[in-house]
Amino acid sequence: MNYSIILPTLNENGHIIQLIKSIKKNFHNKKNNYEIIVVDDNSTDGTISTLKKFKKKNKKVKIFVRNNKKRNLAESLNLGISKAEYENLIWLDADFQHPPEYIKEIFKYSKEYDVVIFSRFLKKSIRYFDKNIKTKEANEDQSIFFNKLCKFIFYKDITDYTSGYICIKKNKIKNIKLKGYYGEYFLSLLIYCKKNNLSILELPFKEKLRKTGSSKTIGGSKVRYVVVCFNYIISIIKNILIKI
């Protein structure tokens, strides 16, 4: 089968090449063809120049830079999806919190299922949580709260509405554009998949510690946390109305 791996990046110079090499290891047996699409949100740490040097000897890697002043994960993914040549789309965080070695698990199920998601909330899943990092703690609390709320309101058979680690058929989402913040866009995407009767499989994985770079997720001050929480709630209400 053929796979387009989309990597949204922002100041990932410290490890982006290591990540790409790790992804490539999943395809060493040549049974599956692939391309790696890097969509950079105008990094300032040398990520772009590092990628361009690496690309000269790696034809499987494609680089696209968003020079928009407003950095946005969903828009980066939309660009990556539009540039993808293959039917099976995989995207994951570029900071190693989504371990690339799990891509091999996707190979087992992507033919049978329209959507394969790695969940942090299944029995065999392991989540990284550093209690010494306050912003991380806030994000963890938010993630737990919103996933429980979404599970209660929407579909109980989905455990992780804000995962961000997914494989999905390109033709199944050709009529939509991803919108919103990190968790908000993923929530809306999953609601869309359920409403359109796409077959969905969740798999457990072991979340890891972010290596280096700048997070595209929430983070930041308590004010920022409250604002994003509010946006999430609005998004949930909108999806309730759509579901009705």
Each predicted region: which residue ranges?
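Short, well-formed alpha-helical segments that are part of the catalytic scaffolds
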Residues: E12-N26
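A conserved acidic beta->alpha catalytic loop
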Residues: D40-S49, F96
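Conserved short acidic donor-positioning loop in nucleotide-sugar-dependent glycosyltransferases
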Residues: D41-N42, N68-R71, A94
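Acceptor/aglycone-binding surface of glycosyltransferases and processive sugar-polymer synthases
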Residues: N68-K83, N88, P100-K179, G183, ...
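Conserved donor nucleotide-binding strand/loop of the catalytic core
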Residues: Y34, I48-K83
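Hydrophobic helical membrane-anchoring modules
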Residues: M1-Y3, I153-K156, L178-I244
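Acidic helix N-cap motif at the loop->helix transition within catalytic regions
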Residues: G14-I17, D45-K53
